[in-house]
Amino acid sequence: NEIQELHAGLNQAFNLLRANGKICVVTFHSIEDRLVKNFTNKVCLRNKKTKLIKPSSKEILSNPRSRSAKLRVIMREQLNFNYIPISELGFEL
């Protein structure tokens, strides 16, 4: 299941990051983006507004498939990180 894989990947990547390290996640579907956004809200204490980058109008004209893409940049603020269960992100398996 793609949602489970994304969830596991976010937890593993964040566990490997040092403090102030950043990861970038590209999503193409709203359900994936919701999981990434909810994960971000759990791990980012100070800066709840993460960097969200959407394709420009020019990019969409030259590449119509890009219109649904969202790039989120997430920074690890703390040294300690605890695994976040998928149920805490609003998803049930």
What are these regions (language model features)?
Residues 1-93:
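S-adenosyl-L-methionine-dependent methyltransferase catalytic core, i.e., the SAM/SAH-binding region
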